[in-house]
Design a protein with these regions (language model features):
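Iron-associated oxidoreductase/ferritin-like identity signal
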Residues: 1-156
Length: 156
């Protein structure tokens, strides 16, 4: 099935965001594990795997629409040197990702590509859940203190 060139370009933009997320979240997970923060590691690692699965879905969709998935284009990684910076970088990445997803969903609606819209809507839901988690962690750090938060994330 031949896809709309603008939709294919936008889907590749969403793919770029997921590929960037895989790398950023994976590195944050491994940094946290190195610091003994098993809980933080587990969540970030799990999210990097989810990003990989979402990227796979986008690759499949682009191929189905007779497009060429661009796996070479990556965004800037926002790597933090400590947990608050990691959360800030993740939040920035996720809010940018959400904006692109929302724009692409609207574009799919306008071109009547409802299958791509539905795929992107599921990815948007996952992204918003991740944003909620990051904002909750930031709230915990602000209200319980960084030391207490880090202690709660340590391996037992």
């Amino acid at each position: 099935m031949k896809g709309d060139p603008e939709i294919l370009q936008s889907l590749n933009g969403c793919l770029k965001d997921q590929l960037t997320a895989i790398n950023q979240l994976f590195l944050h997970a491994r940094m946290a594990r190195n610091w003994g923060l098993g809980g933080f590691n587990d969540y970030e690692y799990g999210r990097s795997i989810k990003a990989m699965k979402m990227a796979d879905r986008l690759i499949e969709r682009v191929l189905f629409l007779d497009g060429l998935p661009n796996l070479q284009d990556l965004g800037k990684l926002l790597i933090g040197e400590n947990v608050p910076e990691m959360l800030g970088g993740d939040l920035q990445m996720l809010t940018d990702m959400r904006a692109r997803l929302q724009d692409t969903i609207r574009q799919c609606e306008d071109t009547r590509d409802f299958i791509s819209r539905d795929e992107l809507s599921e990815i948007l839901e996952e992204t918003e859940e991740h944003i909620d988690w990051v904002e909750s962690q930031q709230w915990l750090i602000t209200n319980a203190g960084l030391e207490n938060y880090l202690q709660s994330q340590m391996e037992v």
